[in-house]
Amino acid sequence: MNSSETTICALASGVCKGGIGVVRVSGPLCKVIAKKMLGFVPKPRYAHYGLFFDQENDEIDKGIALFFPKPHSFTGEDILEFQGHGGMSVMCCLLESVISMGAKPADPGEFSKRAFLNGKMNLVQAEAVADMINANSKRASKSAFRSLSGEFSNQVNALTKSIVELRVFVEATIDFSDEEIDFLQFEQVKLKAKGIKQAVETILKSATQGVILREGLNVVIAGKPNAGKSSLLNALTQESSAIVTDIAGTTRDVLKETICVNGMPLNIIDTAGLHDSDDKIEKEGIKRAHFEIERADVVLMVFDAQDDKPDFSILPKNIDDQPLLLIKNKVDLISGAVKKEMINNIVQLSISAKHSKGMELLRKELSDIAGLEDFSEGVVLSRKRHIIALEESLASIDNAIMQLENGVVELMAEDLRFAGQFMGSITGEFSSDDLLGEIFSSFCIGK
């Protein structure tokens, strides 16, 4: 059945006990349900206080009812809301009554999906609804609100328009190549294409920061057994997240904690000590450690200050492109000072995790790697799919410039078409049903 023909309902206030609970209904049966449960259809956008009735006309609760007629509602459909006492028993009775009158339980994100399909918001704004709910810092929530307000969408739409306009012009040169029309010269076309490329690169940089702001920077602590990795995790999180003993190999699995530095989430991941082992459990822990190291945004290579230097042979071989910080731990044992220095073009921090010395120095270094100092107030929360689309669009624009330089105008127009499609996929202008299903299935029910 088409979504516009069905009526959906959900507990919009979440599955928890509270002072107030909200049941949200959207679809063509809203007026019918209102007449049965209230005895009348509420005046649009006015709060009505009264009794709620079930299918048998028995009283369920007393509260506030709101009616938003289409198209002036969140979903673009008729919307009815019941705001009652937040006990789960009361809310379940309200939901059961609404369902008995023809509504069906909403799927995760179905309200937002209908809002998107009915043109009430684009895909970026729909995603921002979920990001507002899941934001884990003040900075993240502010950035999500900017996306919800259309800031990111407007940037993408402006670029998409520029790409389309350039493609239309290039195609016109193909269609009317034999006629005397005053077209821009070669260098002007190239200049415009490079201007678009530069604009995409700027948005890509901001979006990359937005992904970090949304998902956090994955920081993996690696090193030999008893190097002080777990002590470092505890010092960074300021909690006893990991067991610390003098026995080497205490940590055999992966431990994960999230902290915030200046509003930026950092996912700190402690791993098993890296060394040769015949122990089956230790070997599995080392295997998992290698997996985390290979997918890390930054690796903290921890080694004992009593050793001459870190042993890089214990690290996986294919991490050359990943940021690496050398952490010279236990400097208190050699009467060393907390400091930062460069060792073979790699930053090395001398610290004492046990005594929490040098933690501010480490937090500052992690902030720099994440680009925190470069974060402007204009950064919006982004997703990895946005990054992929921007990178694909950028590659297509590069190809278009190359085709122009080679004099193959037809292929330039085709590459510009691809660039526009990749950009359009961000806001949902060009999106498959599979993509929409994947995006909205991650939402909570009632949104």
Curated annotation (Swiss-Prot):
Enzyme Commission number(s): 3.6.-.-
Binding annotation for (6S)-5-formyl-5,6,7,8-tetrahydrofolate: R24, E81, K120, K447
Pfam families, alphabetized: MMR_HSR1, MnmE_helical, TrmE_N
Top-level lineage group: Bacteria
Main location: cytoplasm
UniProt KW keywords: Cytoplasm, GTP-binding, Hydrolase, Magnesium, Metal-binding, Nucleotide-binding, Potassium, tRNA processing
Binding site for K(+): N226, T245, I247, T250
Stated role: Exhibits a very high intrinsic GTPase hydrolysis rate. Involved in the addition of a carboxymethylaminomethyl (cmnm) group at the wobble position (U34) of certain tRNAs, forming tRNA-cmnm(5)s(2)U34.
Summary of subunit composition and partner proteins: Homodimer. Heterotetramer of two MnmE and two MnmG subunits.
Entry-linked PANTHER family: TRNA MODIFICATION GTPASE GTPBP3, TRNA MODIFICATION GTPASE GTPBP3, MITOCHONDRIAL
Family assignment from sequence similarity: Belongs to the TRAFAC class TrmE-Era-EngA-EngB-Septin-like GTPase superfamily. TrmE GTPase family.
Protein name per UniProt: tRNA modification GTPase MnmE
Species per Swiss-Prot/TrEMBL record: Ruthia magnifica subsp. Calyptogena magnifica
Gene field: mnmE
